[in-house]
Amino acid sequence: MVLLFWISKQKAGEPMSERKTQQELDFERKHEEDLQRIRDFRLIDDDFMAAVFEDHDCAEFLLRIILKRDDLVVREVRGQYSIKNLQGRSVRLDILAVDRNNRAYNIEVQRSDRGASEKRARYNSSLLDANLTDSGEEYDALNETYVIFITENDILRAGLPIYHIDRTVQETGMIFNDQAHIIYVNSQIKDETALGKLMHDFFCTDSRKMYYPILANRVWYFKENEKGVATMCRAMEKMRDETAAEQNIKTLLVSVKNLMKNMNLSPEQAMDAMGISEDDRKMLLQRI
């Protein structure tokens, strides 16, 4: 009787050896969600944009169109590049490129207006100055820099496809040639110009609908090629881990500050009481 009951249960479901654990089911669900996200990615999405334009030729192509300079040659390019601010905390840039004349380009895509404010542009410009020169170098050694925001909305609200910002002398109108440039690209304008077609491509989820083959091929690689898809999946897993780690630090920071306030402790004493690891201590001390 027991044997018949066991056999009937086995027929009703999968063999025990083939049943999946909850962990395996969760992994498959998460993987399928990642694949769907990859299918929906566009170049206006910063993580995907960073992966595509980390390619040397794609970055060079992008800059040539935005700056209207066919002579521009990129020497090196990095995606999701971390640099330090004055407090020693890491700030991640979508793209950092340097050309053969040592000009530096920070390219950011921003879907929210707040992330592309005027002071954010100034902040990024200062980060480039602080990180691209060695200690003790003369100010004349500063790189010429470009901070380029590609924005989902028309941040400056003048209906133009592109805005160039340079310091000027108010009394004369002359350019103050500090060689620190800021550019806003309005992705709302998708006309038949080279820049308009580029902005069209920034909103395509399907590489077959893109104007520029050099970008379409790179988008296809990350969406359709097995190796490219695997690369994006690993990148997304890394982002999840980093997000979880950042949330953990924020939670610890609140607890440490509360303990310091309520018990009148120093940061070190509060972290000792909480048994915080050495790695987490270093990160917390930068923020307290």
What is the role of each PLM region?
Residues V2-D178, D191-T193:
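Accessory alpha/beta interaction modules
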Residues V2-R39, L43, D47, V98-R100, ...:
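Short, charged alpha-helical interaction segments and adjacent helix-coil junctions
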